From Swiss-Prot:
Originating species: Zygnema circumcarinatum
Position of the signal peptide: none
Gene: ndhJ
Compartments reported by the entry: Plastid, Chloroplast thylakoid membrane
Source domain of life: Eukaryota
Intrachain S-S bonds: none
GO molecular function, one term: NADH dehydrogenase (ubiquinone) activity
Similarity field: Belongs to the complex I 30 kDa subunit family.
Catalytic activity annotation: a plastoquinone + NADH + (n+1) H(+)(in) = a plastoquinol + NAD(+) + n H(+)(out); a plastoquinone + NADPH + (n+1) H(+)(in) = a plastoquinol + NADP(+) + n H(+)(out)
The name this protein goes by in its record: NAD(P)H-quinone oxidoreductase subunit J, chloroplastic
EC number: 7.1.1.-
Amino acid sequence: MTNLAFQSSSQIQGRLSAWLVTHKLPHRPLGFDYQGVETIEVRPEDWPSVAVALYVYGFNYLRCQCAYDVAPGGALASVYHLTKVEDVADQPEELCVKLFVSRNNPSVPSSFWIWKSADFQERECYDMFGIVYKNHPHLKRILMPESWLGWPLRKDYITPDFYELQDAY
């Protein structure tokens, strides 16, 4: 898929998408959410350059980073909610960026080096979905024990047999 083909979409292109096109940064507009926040898709290999450009644009706060399983056997998504925090802004500008990866080799460049708040959030997505964030300084399980097998929030995850102890105190 060429960059131009990636940029073309039937979705409405917002102001940030137009800015990214002006600077020849590959992405695909996905429209707006119910609150009017613009949503774009970026390929994982393009994420480092787009993330730096968005930071330079003014998105200095990573409000939330999460992941979800699109469909059983389908792609996984890593989602970044960015906010442009300014002293005099009563309604800060926001953007949602989605990166879709194959569940067979889920790998996304880490944004920790741009937004430090990505640290625990990327670790949680790794722990629950198995998305590897390349160049993350301490990517390891954060909620599950290191010995845990599999990725519990994937739709195709099979729960291991275990027995709950009743009144164990």
